[in-house]
């Protein structure tokens, strides 16, 4: 009888535990904590996804080559609360993006602020 109750309890605990959403998450340790960079470019792709969204911006360098910069942001629910929709940043949109750059120098950053060509400011965190 005790074994049956123990198995039942273990089964219930396992089911409850599996019901919690499990998602991979990482810290922001790879980004500079204070330093920021600002780039001007054209939206290549806006990945409005969980657990983090990514904004890809093609930047034309001084030597006329291009570099694709990735800007990590919060997931869609947080962006939505901040007033940002996927449709706000279509491919081809000219933008100026400020972010906290990667410590290792790769062309990526944590998205801090964005200004569209029409002057609209998009901040990825609700105020």
Where are the language model's segments positioned?
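OB-fold/S1-family single-stranded nucleic acid-binding modules
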Residues: 102-125
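Bacterial N-terminal signal peptides
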Residues: 9-21
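Short aromatic-glycine-enriched beta-strand elements
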Residues: 49-60
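Short boundary/loop segments of OB/S1/cold-shock single-stranded nucleic-acid-binding domains
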Residues: 22-37
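Conserved hydrophobic positions within beta-strands
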Residues: 39-43
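Short nucleic-acid-contacting surface segments enriched for D/E, G, S/T with interspersed K/R
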Residues: 80-97
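Short, structured beta-strand/loop micro-motifs enriched in basic residues and often containing a Trp
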Residues: 73-81
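A short macromolecule-binding patch
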Residues: 62-74
């Amino acid at each position: 009888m005790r074994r049956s109750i123990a198995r039942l309890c273990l089964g219930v605990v396992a089911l409850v535990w599996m019901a919690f959403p499990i998602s991979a998450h990482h810290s922001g340790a790879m980004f500079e904590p204070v330093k920021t960079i600002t780039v001007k470019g054209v939206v290549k792709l806006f990945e409005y996804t969980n657990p983090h969204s990514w904004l890809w911006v093609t930047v034309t360098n001084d030597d006329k080559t291009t570099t694709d910069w990735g800007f990590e942001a919060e997931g869609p629910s947080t962006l939505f609360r901040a007033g940002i929709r996927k449709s706000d940043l279509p491919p081809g949109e000219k933008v100026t993006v400020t972010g906290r750059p990667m410590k290792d120098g790769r062309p990526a950053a944590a998205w801090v602020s964005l200004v569209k060509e029409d002057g609209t400011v998009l901040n990825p965190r609700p105020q």
